[in-house]
Structure formats: structure tokens, C-alpha cells
């Protein structure tokens, strides 16, 4: 039974890839529309449960009226049908409705809807461009995805379940009052009007301050996670106090915003408490007056008094429910600002998989400047023949890594074209493009998973023999065999920590090289691939790199010019343009920028260009 209800909302539905709406109501409908049958069933269960709950007070009043009659041996016989119906509703129907309601909410909606929404949001956010993640804290983005899923579910459940329950409960109470004497309705109607005025005044203020507090919470979370992520920097520079002040500033801001939010809540709570006092006093006083005049029975007094006390007790819950709804809506609004952003790099509707036959690459009059007015790369033309190995050289900021980034389509060009085997990469799928290019960067970042998982990222279907062969070529088997993590996992099963922090820079680089060896893509990009290796290890794996580069088109970047001097051709860049091209010997003879860079490095001034 539990499993059946838990299967009503699948957590991993098909992903359509559409951008979520940027307005609140369409955003809710985007995620709630597919699960409407479950929400409708919950609404109906809540309706029936509210009717039964109110009926209990009616039954109580009826029993009091029965008891007020003259007792006799035929009492149970005279009231058998009515008492039997009350017993059925109380002992059988009500528990069934409570169970059904709880199964729908707790087994289907709570775990299903929130995690389903998170999965869909994550699937969209993870497709954002590199600049999206560079412009925000990773912790803030993750917090918004997680919190938005929770708040969307909570507010949806409260609106479908709790608010509907409140409306039906109050409406039925008014009906029962009218059945006894229409004048009993007056205090409750006046209370409802006063309650509505209170909500109209306080709720918009609560909503606004909840949104502000949610934004401050995401900011504080981002700063805390940023500090944890960069803990080595914090330790090395001994700025613990400064970092604490940086985090404290955001927490103080959160505290101020949170206090402003709770002031509204406290004011609303106090005002409702005053109005509730008038409701109880007015209803009880009016009921006694009507009874004294012979207009209602003792049972009606019991019904009226019991219902208003129940409504009084519910009023706090109603207040928190409505306040919670708008607080959750505020959190969802905050999440929308991050989650519902258009994708700056996305596949065209008619995009096709890239087919690499030879591996030739052409850059045709490309312009790219990160959305600014100019700079970085301007009017660059370059042809890399199939199987050719070129080295990109130039001072820092020349545009070398940017050229690689646009080749990988981490960013889209402002103008121009990049062709691979004659196919414009703007018209192929991003996934197929990156599957055909192996990359080793200078800043190797590993996933907080096992060594094996990180290696298989290069080729998920690789056999154990293929995996170990790649590791051996990268000269990584010796240190992998000695690894033990905090959970006692060893070797290939040892976890490497966040971003691979448990490994040295050289060890991470060798894992990255092994991963690309395993991928065996036809086009290879080496961005300072051996920068983190010592000279002995670099020399040891150079033969493996030469083997890896065999038959492939290679684009290599290195500040250490000796590592790429053997390339077929060197391309010298400066300020986003190609200023020289040729072999090492030709460029030295030309006496240009490359010759000056070479002279500085061989003269002992390598740091000047790094």
C-alpha cells in the first residue's frame, strides 16, 4: 500500500528542457500541472475530512439534546439509527479518511513533489553556461534549488489541503449555526470579516519581508559555503578573523531581515488573539441569551460553543498556514531569479550530432569579448589540419584559454564560425561536440567520488583492463594503490574529497591525464596539462602523451615553452590576435614575441611571463 501511494508521483520524469516561467503563478503551474490528479484527490479527502470534523460537534450537540430528554428503557431503541450512524462516522469513516489523507500527503506529495521539482530544476540549471556559475556562489545556487523545491511543495499542499479545509470547515459551521438559529451566525461572520481585514493588512507585508529574508539567507549560505570550499586559502593567509567578519556581516543582515519578518508575524498573532476573544465571548453570550429566551436548545449551545472554541484554536494554525504560504511563495520568488534564467548557450532546435572523421578545425574570423564592447579575441582566423599538433603561445591574457573555451562551446561567439570537419559547431549538439574532444586543464577539479568513478567519467563503458592500462600510461598506479580515505576505502575505491582536495596537484593531474587517455577522443586539448607535475614525472609520462597525441588533432597551451617546442606548429597570440606562426626554429630566427619569451625563460625569468 505504501509503495503504491509513493509511486503516484515519479521523482524522475522525462525532462523536456524548457525554461521554467519567470512569473510566480506560471512557475507553480509548470511544476504542479503534471501531478494534478494527486492534488485533486488530496483536495477531496480534505473536503470530506473537514465535513466529518464539523459533524463531530453536531453529534455532540445532538447527544446533549438526547440526554436532556426523559430517560427510558427504550432510549437506545429510539435513537439506534442516529447513534449507529455517529458510531460509524467516528470509528470507521473518520480513521479511513485520516489514513487516506495522510497517505496522499506524507507518502505521495511530500517526498514525491519536492524531489521531482528539485530534479527538474537541477536538470535545467546544470545546463547553464560557465558564466552563470562564475557569477554566483555555488552554495547559493544549490540552496535555491533545494529550498525552492521544498517551498513549492509546502505552499501547494497548504493551498490545496489546509486552505480548502479551512473554507469548508467554516462554511459548514455557518450552516449548522443557521440550522439552530440564524442569529448565531452573526459573531462568526463579524469575526470572518475582521480576520479578512487582518490578513489583507498583514499578509502582503509578511510576503515581502519573507522574500527579503530568503534572499539574505541565500547570501549567507553562499558566503559560508564559499569559505568552506576555499578553506586552504583561508588557512594559508591566516585571515580567519577577516573571514569571520565577512560571514558575520551576512548573518547579521539575515538576522535583521528575519526580525523584520517576525515583527509582522507577532503583530498579526496579537491582533488575532484579541479578535478571537470577542468571537468566543460574543458567541457564548448570544447562545445563552437565545437559550434563555427559548429559541435554541442546550445542544445548540454545546454545538456553538464547541465550534467557536475549535475555530479559536484553529485561528493560530490558520494564521501560520497563510503566513507560511506567503513565506514559501517568497522563497519560490527568490528561487525563480536564479532558476528561471534563459540558457545563454543552448542547442538549436535542428542541432545534429557532430561527426568527426579526420579532426580538422577551422576558426573563421571569430570575435568574442565576454559580452563587453571589445577585446579578448577579435577577428581571429586559424586552420588546424587533421592530425596536426599546434601549440598556443603568448603572455597571460592573450586569449589562449578563451580560444579553447569557444572551441568547446562553453561560450557562444559574438560573430564568426568554428568548423570541425566542415561542420559549424553552432549547429551540432553540445554533448556530441564535447564527446569528441579530450581536455586536460591546468586547474584539474575532480568529483568527490572514488578514483574509479572519476576515471570512468572519461569513458563510462571502459573495462577494468582498459582503465588500469590508462592509469599505467599516466604513471598513476603507484600512488593510487596506496590511497586510503576516511571511510577505509582503498585504491580505486578511495574517495578523493571535494574537488580532489585529498590528492596533491600532481596526483590530480595524472588522474586527469589517465581520464583523457581512457576517453581517447580524436581531438585533444592540453591547457597546461603538465604544469602541476615535477620534471621527473613530466619526463616519465611524456612518452605516454606522445602516444596519446598520435593520430589526433592537438591544441596545446603552455607557458613553459620547452613542453610544446616539438609541436608541428606554434601559434603566438597577443591581445586576442595571432601575431606569429611557425616552428620553434622559425620563430626564434624571426626574433619576435616568441623569441623574447623564449629568451626570458631560458635566461631564468620564467616567472615574468607566468
Give the location of each predicted region.
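Membrane-integrated ABC transporters
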Residues: 1-53, 67-87, 101-109, 113, ...
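Juxtamembrane helix-loop junctions of ABC transporter transmembrane domains
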Residues: 10-21, 52-61, 65-68, 90-134, ...
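Alpha-helical segments in transporter systems
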Residues: 26, 37-62, 83, 87, ...
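Transmembrane helices of ABC transporter permease
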Residues: 34, 38-48, 93, 158-212, ...
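Loop segments that connect adjacent transmembrane helices in multi-pass transporters
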Residues: 136-139, 212-260, 332-334, 338, ...
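ABC-type nucleotide-binding domain
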Residues: 354-610
